[in-house]
């Protein structure tokens, strides 16, 4: 789904947009975009093949490292109220809290990934008000900002050798910053948009060993589900130049490039999951030629996690029973009971768009 439409539904889910306003805004959006815009990508229908939707991939920024990504070590997320967010993920997604030191909580995503939640998030000022109903995109009306931002991710690579990794990064024009503690070894670098990329020695044998028995100060917001998170369905990664970013991660971390749709590229992160690297982090496309280009930026618009035994009515019922929204998303492929792609979006206490899907390693290409 395009960023503008995702934001519209996000406002509706949070109660900041009435049903009438949503329908009015959707009428505007549909007039501006083909129906295919409701699915992932912006270059379907009549826009396919236009200059704005050129599917030619970018050249690689440097010689490939030959590394393979073998682990989602952890996501890094800053929120306004981290104990509340941690308690929510623990109850809804059944992620175990490994630790909470009063400044951040570390959670296990199933037995294959991690999440570090930090406090201290300061929301940016809202955009100027407008008489039009909130459109959720450039030039739209007032929209309260999220109180959460995923601002980094850490990936474990195979055949770790700290000196060789540092040399490989420097010879490719990157500036690695070591971040080590105990058996944990890593380097931070910046991607083309300045996003914090951490590369580590993490693998399934040296991470998340032993039971996670931590607690956070916030109470559980509702009864815990029995869901098991088994797959990283996709990260929606909105960047300034998706072609450059896709080429960067392909060359550096070995992520397999998908078909360039003209506005995004869905890449495979080994046997961990997928990432949709998409247009949306700037670019100043509508500005005058003389205008100063904006600072490049990247953001995770949403993250979709696959759970075991996904059954549409049961999942929706669990969300509704807990007072949570459940916005259906089949990627434009029809009824959720028969579509090949099945998922629901909901919103975390700090306002992040969490997607829960039926996608697993076994059906990732369905």
Name each region found by the language model.
Residues 16, 25-31, 77-124, 179, ...:
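Core segments of cupin and vicinal oxygen chelate
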Residues 3-9, 79-86, 91, 146-193, ...:
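Vicinal oxygen chelate
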Residues 1-17, 21, 28-30, 41-42:
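N-terminal secretory signal peptides
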Residues 6-14, 44-83, 113, 150-157, ...:
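N-terminal beta-strand motif that seeds the catalytic metal site of vicinal oxygen chelate
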Residues 43-62, 96-148, 159, 196-204, ...:
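Conserved short beta-strand elements that form part of the metal-binding/catalytic scaffold
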């Amino acid at each position: 789904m395009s960023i503008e439409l995702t934001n519209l539904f996000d406002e509706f889910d949070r109660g900041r947009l009435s049903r009438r306003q949503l329908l009015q805004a959707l009428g505007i959006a549909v007039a501006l975009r083909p129906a295919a815009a409701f699915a992932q990508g912006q270059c379907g229908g009549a826009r396919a093949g236009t200059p704005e939707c050129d599917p030619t991939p970018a050249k690689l920024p440097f010689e490939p490292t030959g590394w393979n990504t073998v682990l989602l070590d952890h996501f890094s997320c800053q929120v306004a109220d981290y104990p509340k967010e941690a308690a929510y993920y623990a109850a809804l997604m059944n992620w175990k809290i490994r630790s909470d030191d009063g400044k951040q909580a570390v959670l296990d995503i199933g037995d294959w990934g991690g999440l570090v939640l930090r406090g201290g998030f300061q929301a940016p000022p809202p955009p100027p008000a407008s008489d039009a109903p909130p459109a959720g995109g450039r030039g739209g009306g007032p929209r309260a900002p999220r109180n959460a931002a995923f601002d980094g991710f850490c990936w474990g690579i195979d055949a770790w050798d700290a000196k060789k990794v540092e040399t490989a990064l420097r010879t490719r024009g990157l500036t690695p910053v070591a971040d080590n503690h105990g058996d944990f070894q890593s380097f931070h670098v910046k991607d083309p948009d300045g996003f914090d990329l951490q590369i580590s020695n993490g693998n399934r044998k040296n991470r998340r060993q032993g039971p996670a028995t931590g607690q956070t100060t916030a109470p559980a917001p509702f009864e815990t589900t029995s869901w098991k998170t088994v797959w990283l369905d996709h990260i929606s990664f909105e960047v300034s130049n998706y072609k450059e970013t896709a080429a960067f991660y392909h060359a550096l971390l070995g992520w397999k490039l998908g078909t360039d749709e003209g506005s995004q590229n869905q890449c495979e992160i080994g046997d961990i999951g997928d990432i949709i690297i998409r247009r949306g982090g700037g670019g100043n496309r509508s500005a005058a030629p003389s205008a100063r280009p904006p600072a490049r930026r990247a953001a995770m618009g949403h993250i979709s996690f696959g759970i075991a035994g996904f059954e549409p009515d049961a999942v929706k019922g669990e969300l509704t029973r807990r007072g949570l929204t459940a916005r259906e998303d089949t990627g434009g492929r029809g009824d959720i009971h028969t579509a090949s792609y099945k998922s629901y979006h909901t919103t975390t206490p700090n306002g992040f768009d969490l997607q829960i899907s039926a996608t697993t390693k076994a059906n990732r290409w369905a």
